[in-house]
Amino acid sequence: MTDLTTLEADVLAQVAAAGDLAALDAVRVSALGKTGRVSGLLKTLGAMSPDERKERGAAINVLRDRVQTALNDKKAALETAALDARLASETLDLTLPAPRRRKGSVHPTMQTMDEMVAIFAEMGFAVAEGPDIEDDFHNFTALNFPPKHPAREMHDTFFFNPAKNEDGSDGERMLLRTHTSPVQVRTMLSQKPPIRIIAPGRTYRCDNDATHTPVFHQVEGLVIDKAIHMGHLKWTLETFLARFFETDAVKTQFRPHHFPFTEPSAETDVQCDRSGGEIKVGQGTSWLEILGCGMVHPNVLRACGIDPDEYQGFAFGMGVDRLGMLKYGMPDLRDMWSSDGRWLAHYGFSAFAAPNAASGLS
């Protein structure tokens, strides 16, 4: 067994002398690899008698276990030393100031919508919501749109391909809502008057220029009750606009217009100053259209199961993005969705500045 003792001493000396993991692995291969010095001893057992093979084999296994244990211990020691060296080279100076991280901000559109909701909530309106994907009835038919109305065409509305029925025929064609008016329809179908709601949310149309985007945001309002008239509508809008622009100097004018879902219908303008490349609401001699409104058409009331001889109502709709542009001086609507961090840093709002009518909107 003298040869085994000598071999063990030699291999363990090589293990102890290994200065890194690569050198240690070379020792492992030379000793325990397929052609290694310890592994080679096992090949000599076949020429021995059973008794010799038993005694010699046990001794070789003991040698192999000792070498493997030494290798494992040395590997752990080398890894610990390497980690200690790395940590020593990566020490942190805790007296240095922490790196500044850029703060996120609330998008102007979301801030504007929150401001609008806060004002209408103070005026007694509840918030109603509905799906972005709508059917023809809720988006058009119930709102008194004629069958051949241009809004029903592909150039103005985003339609989905119709699903197939079991017989292979085309099913109903769904669409992305072109306004939040379907929320009004769903509310009238599910609730009895009196109704006083606003419907904020995303809407979609095939439009893209400096003042229009394919995806935009609206806040629509609906009031249904007995003896409702245009005077109630006018007071509601003028009160809202004065609160939103935070000035009592806001002047409005109502121009006759046509909407399928209201009769009479009007567009509302605010007086403004366009000089100096900036629009200032509440001063000047110019007028700017900002919303549409009117008395709910009797056909819409009937489609929703409400008797127009007993109940009347008014509705209005305004673009959140455009109102935000006017209030905060943003020149191009498309910049809102350009994902430009510099623009958002300039026009964004603190997440802790949630608007409410009591403490101020902005």
UniProtKB/Swiss-Prot annotation:
Q: Which domain of life is it from?
A: Bacteria
State what protein this is by name: Phenylalanine--tRNA ligase alpha subunit
Subunit structure as annotated in this protein's UniProt entry: Tetramer of two alpha and two beta subunits.
Q: Quick one: a GO biological-process term for this protein?
A: phenylalanyl-tRNA aminoacylation
Q: Which Pfam families match?
A: Phe_tRNA-synt_N, tRNA-synt_2d
Q: Which GO terms describe its cellular component?
A: cytoplasm
Q: Which residues bind Mg(2+)?
A: E263
Q: Where in the cell is it found?
A: Cytoplasm
| EC number, as in UniProt | 6.1.1.20
Q: Which family does it belong to?
A: Belongs to the class-II aminoacyl-tRNA synthetase family. Phe-tRNA synthetase alpha subunit type 1 subfamily.
- Cofactor(s) demanded: Mg(2+)
Q: How is the cofactor bound?
A: Binds 2 magnesium ions per tetramer.
InterPro entries named in the record: aa-tRNA-synth_II (IPR006195), aa-tRNA-synth_II/BPL/LPL (IPR045864), Phe-tRNA-synth_IIc_asu (IPR004529), Phe-tRNA_ligase_II_N (IPR004188), Phe_tRNA_ligase_alpha1_bac (IPR022911), Phenylalanyl-tRNA_Synthase (IPR002319), tRNA-bd_arm (IPR010978)
Top-tier EC class: ligase
A GO term for molecular function = tRNA binding
The gene for this chain is pheS
